[in-house]
């Protein structure tokens, strides 16, 4: 996608949104760290993001690593709520969470040809 984005992402967050944006960072930008927390659906779901990006020894190349977590926490477990006689025992109520993790490795490169830079990048995601 190169620079074909509505809102340009050329920082550590580019690993998820547009990996080619990592190539816009210069070696002088050094190591970048980023973190984000967002609550979805009125606080029911939690979205967390942690990443870092660093330049390689070759100019114009950049690596990025990201961890994404989406979870729904404190889900009531009502399987043991009822006793054998049919009465309700709230002491048997417990909670659990449902969580998905994704790990991303990103690589970006910038090539300067003729009229301006050409940036490309890609990510490998493991869920």
Name each region found by the language model:
Residues 2-127:
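Subset of outer-membrane beta-barrel
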């Amino acid at each position: 996608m190169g620079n074909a984005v509505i809102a340009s992402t050329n920082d550590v967050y580019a690993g998820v949104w547009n990996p080619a944006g990592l190539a816009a960072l210069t070696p002088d930008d050094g190591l970048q760290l980023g973190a984000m927390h967002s609550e979805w659906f009125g606080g029911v779901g939690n979205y967390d993001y942690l990443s870092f990006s660093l330049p390689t020894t070759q100019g114009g190349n950049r690596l990025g690593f990201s961890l994404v977590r989406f979870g729904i926490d404190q889900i009531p477990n009502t399987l043991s709520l009822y006793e054998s006689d049919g009465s309700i025992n709230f002491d048997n109520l417990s909670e659990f969470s449902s969580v998905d993790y994704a790990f991303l490795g990103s690589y970006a490169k910038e090539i300067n040809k003729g009229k301006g830079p050409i940036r490309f990048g890609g990510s490998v995601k493991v869920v």
